[in-house]
């Protein structure tokens, strides 16, 4: 863990729970793509940079989830680097309490106010094309998070952030977090058509051919949707839908899973309703969902 792995002449990644991209820009200057899941990750990343004689100029966050921005504040305090994040991800990075608040749908209890869901805040700037090094471009990858992006470097390495997960992760945890099912599927379809020398997903192995994994992720989204429709053959409320999925997949409920999977299931319900697969109605002061 926290091994520096070279991908191309200019690009590396630090193997960690969420890969940290390292891109050489000019001379001994480098930028990072994400900063890891905690200040410890930031410390280890900085140590690797210093061992190679590199100077950190900026961190480009793909999105605002805590496992990608956890090292921001440490790196900023110890190097003075600038930090950038796209769209609404910047607001969540500046104000991390928004993350558990969004997931829970209200003021989050103490069980959701921890480093895995709520990183330390950092002074974060809007990600614009002018902020990127020459030859580096941001690629919109919404779905997993609101305004998530990936990055393509000048030597055609594509960092894919969290737009897809490994087969092992999908098979083990079943429900992969997302905020927008439609956007997620559209992103995966675009990824299927991408070319790169190497793709670097944050939570899967690097590869020169991403198509099979992207298709596997697409299939899993539709599988979950089908399971939700099956649960909704009779009118049923959200809590029962969530319980039914946990029972079917052999998952164990706790506050964190309730928030993460619950938020994701609500996104599926919205998508299925808009697609015409579910109808929603109120009965006896309860919101019920039923397969059409």
Where does each model-flagged region fall?
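Hydrophobic/aromatic beta-strand patches that form the interior of the parallel beta-sheet core
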Residues: 12, 60, 84, 125-127, ...
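Conserved beta-strand hairpin/beta-sheet module of binuclear metal-dependent hydrolase folds
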Residues: 1-52, 150-162
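Active-site HxH/HxHxD metal-binding segment of metal-dependent hydrolases
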Residues: 40-132
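A structural signal for the main folded, soluble domain(s) of proteins
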Residues: 29, 43, 50, 70, ...
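A short catalytic or substrate-binding loop motif that flags glycine-/basic-rich loops and adjacent residues
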Residues: 14-16, 132, 141-145
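Metallo-beta-lactamase
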Residues: 37-39, 137-225
